Regions:
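Ferredoxin-type iron-sulfur electron-transfer modules and their immediate structural context
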Residues: 1-40, 44, 103-119, 161, ...
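A contiguous, basic/glycine-rich beta-loop/short-helix subdomain that forms a polymer-engagement track
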Residues: 77-101
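Mobile, glycine- and charge-enriched loop segments
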Residues: 106-141
């Protein structure tokens, strides 16, 4: 424990959200419009700031709920960067289908609870059915309408989401996005 006092350095907290205030629909001329990111942030890291919103990177826990419900794309989940998530999704589904796989069901799970549950199923049971493809993400709540529709476009028959009990308070935005995708 005394060795800790000699440790010197920096800690860099990741910035989970990229925010483009130019396309934010929060407010204009003092008239409030969209508040979806504020309403769905479980940590309170997003606050109104005039005609835009302010993201506090030190409070943000990186759940991605804000990005998944943002109608304009002003809030974008930054991890992984760019199109990495969609490229992984497309590659996995194309490979499965090209190998003769049928009726792919995508199981979206986080890297903590989800991976542990899938491992437990493999150790203590028969594992996942052959047509259920696990897809690991940083936080399940980061997926939104764009991801759900892309999964269907890339060949997924269904998208299943494994959400840990500790995240049950963060599911409202995700459920709204899933209902919208189902309607489309």
């Amino acid at each position: 424990l005394l060795e800790l006092t000699d440790m010197v350095g920096e800690f860099q907290k990741p910035r989970y959200v990229d925010y483009d205030e130019a396309i934010c629909a929060h407010a204009s001329a003092g008239i409030t419009g969209c508040t979806r990111c504020i309403d769905n942030c479980p940590t309170g890291a997003i606050t109104p700031d005039g005609d835009k919103v302010n993201f506090d990177p030190y409070i943000c826990a990186g759940c991605g709920a804000c990005a998944s419900v943002c109608p304009t794309g002003a809030a974008r989940y930054a991890l992984p960067a760019g199109d990495t998530l969609f490229n992984r999704l497309r590659t996995m589904l194309r490979t499965y289908l090209a190998a003769g796989g049928k009726n792919p069901n995508l199981l979206v799970a986080d890297t903590e609870y989800g991976d542990d549950m899938i491992d437990a199923m493999a150790r203590n049971g028969g594992g996942l059915p052959a047509n259920v493809l696990p897809f690991s993400v940083n936080e399940v709540t980061m997926i939104g309408l764009d991801f759900l529709l892309a999964a269907g476009a890339f060949g997924a028959e269904r998208v299943l989401v494994l959400l840990g009990p500790q995240k049950s308070g963060e599911k409202d935005g995700l459920e709204d996005e899933m209902a919208l995708a189902e309607a489309i």
